[in-house]
């Protein structure tokens, strides 16, 4: 699934990473606990979270993720957006709740392949 399609499905606003809109991902994960992402998540392209701090960007970068979707209407700070740009990570915001966002993406064919 293309990053652009994820944005459309979640009615998300793109804040960074326009150059990644045509990038393909095959899996996603959802967590507000970055320690769980580091411990249990493998080979995920998209991180769905409601946590707003720079550790989200750093964790996604360490895990080679190419897109972060902030849910529940949460908006990252300017500093977070700039850090994501430096790391080459697309950043989106959606008003949808995490459960709903995951369900929509799963129904559209995105999986949790490689994760727990």
Predicted regions and their residues:
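Short secondary-structure junctions
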Residues: 12-17, 112-113
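Feature captures the catalytic cores and cofactor-binding loops of soluble hydro-lyases/lyases
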Residues: 22-23, 31-46, 51-116
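Short, structural beta-strand-to-alpha-helix junction motif
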Residues: 2-4, 97
